[in-house]
């Protein structure tokens, strides 16, 4: 991960910009630079992953134009080969192709990128700024306006709090130019429904996911894998292990009392022959880390915070004890193939609508969690299930095939990898809520801690002062109060609490955990 920031007009207060930008130096601890473009400021904190030499340091410059980009551009070598006919390059960085690409294609370039990215371009010829974000929002970007009405962009909301009145997430799949946000890609939209037979669909799913993992193994820095023992991360690890000439490094975490995941993660690690590490977390670590995790995340969402506790502590351990710089994770599978609660979808049409909603909101929930937990520990997250070709294909598959009519959720994904990729019991293991999987006790400790902080009268009184996404439990109130401490008045960055679709029968619940659903069954065992 890297961190970027831009002030898009002259007369910027350099010291204020620098102070705001320092808040995300952990995203890019290798080098930092702020430049004056003549009409504003651009900042870059570098975490070197591709092109590790100083020549790969940003901003990149081309005839008075500049770019800063937090991104990974897959297959950039082919684009670079074509651009070499007209341009010279000084580094091995994938992001150096961006300015030549912009000169050749303008904002049409964004449709051409197979990438996860957030970028800011200063067009020196037109004296204006362009910003853009990848179609899913895997790389973070926020914007706001200062007192003079000047727009600012930054990798995280914390960079802009205090400098801008109202901070909002930059919409994924959009670019900003001439005061307008323009959508260049709606990754959740379906151009044409795919009616291939089951075996063809599963063959395509298998091939496209393998390709998505493959391209994310390319790095000049060392790569590791988060392995929960659940279906999604286990598949990523199994695919990578087949592609690697030496054992991959896998990491799992769980509570000391009742970690469900650790035994399954070890079973997978033994099966694929990985160099595996288990990290144990305690009640004290969870409670002591809570405020820092919420400050890091920039959210009050219950499930995002719960699921971040283990991920943050695991990534912290990896940062402090290894030389790994890149981590592959299993996010974005549920949004595509279904959660436990989508078993209750009343129709294929409703299943598809819910999937589209979840994909379009990913940048506020699971993707945000993975980015912050990993990047705050000076690591880079890569998400194979977020591969654009893979997502586009799965979204196009007839939703009737994706619904759970097989007696097992996410059947297409499971069936696609039947064979010897994973042990059968792992491949067909019931999904466990992540907060359950690291240990039932973790969520119980968080709830217990919150319960002890407020009387019933205090709880009711404190909840009343919030109008947007009003807290409804003592746990949610605690998270909101910590959020407001660091992001005062910025709650609209998050549209609402992540919850199952309450309009569906069986889903009208008041806790985001799948544990409260009637179909959870054996999932948490």
Where in this protein do the model-derived segments appear?
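Conserved S-adenosyl-L-methionine
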Residues: 184-185, 423-432
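A short, aromatic/hydrophobic, helix- or strand-capping loop or linear motif
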Residues: 27-35, 90-95, 141, 405-410
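Short, polar/flexible loop-turn hinges at active-site or ligand-entry regions and domain interfaces
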Residues: 83-92, 107-109, 160-167, 300-302, ...
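Acidic-aromatic/histidine active-site loop/patch
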Residues: 98
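ATP-dependent adenylate-handling active sites, centered on carboxylate activation for C-N bond formation
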Residues: 8-14, 85, 104, 125-130, ...
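Structural signal for conserved beta-strand scaffold positions within catalytic alpha/beta enzyme cores
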Residues: 44, 91, 183-186, 252, ...
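N-terminal glutamine amidotransferase
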Residues: 1-68, 72, 101-196, 203-214, ...
